[in-house]
Amino acid sequence: GCNIEFDNYSNTIHAEEAAISAFISAGEKNPLCIAVFTFGDKATFPCGMCLQSLFELGGKNLKIIACNKNTCESKTISELLPMGFNL
């Protein structure tokens, strides 16, 4: 997925949201890993809202890999969102 930014910033679609939508639309379930990339100076992990959505889709052991042009860092979603929940 990719970020889609609008003038009304609350309508912006995060790359993770777009990736989740494509994943589900393709009939997939239970992802093992998701990678995010930025051209910035620091590898950046998903925001809290996206982490919660990823937690609900992939569970507490989902691996998140954050990369920039120089490095990659890997964490489980439980490390990034220790209080993730399912209803």
Show which residues each predicted segment covers.
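Short linear motifs in exposed loops
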Residues: 1-2, 76
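Active-site- and interface-proximal helix/loop "cap" or "latch" segments in soluble metabolic
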Residues: 12, 16, 22-30
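Short, well-ordered amphipathic alpha-helices
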Residues: 19-20, 51
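C-terminal binding/interaction regions
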Residues: 26-87
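Compact, glycine-rich, soluble single-domain proteins
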Residues: 2-17
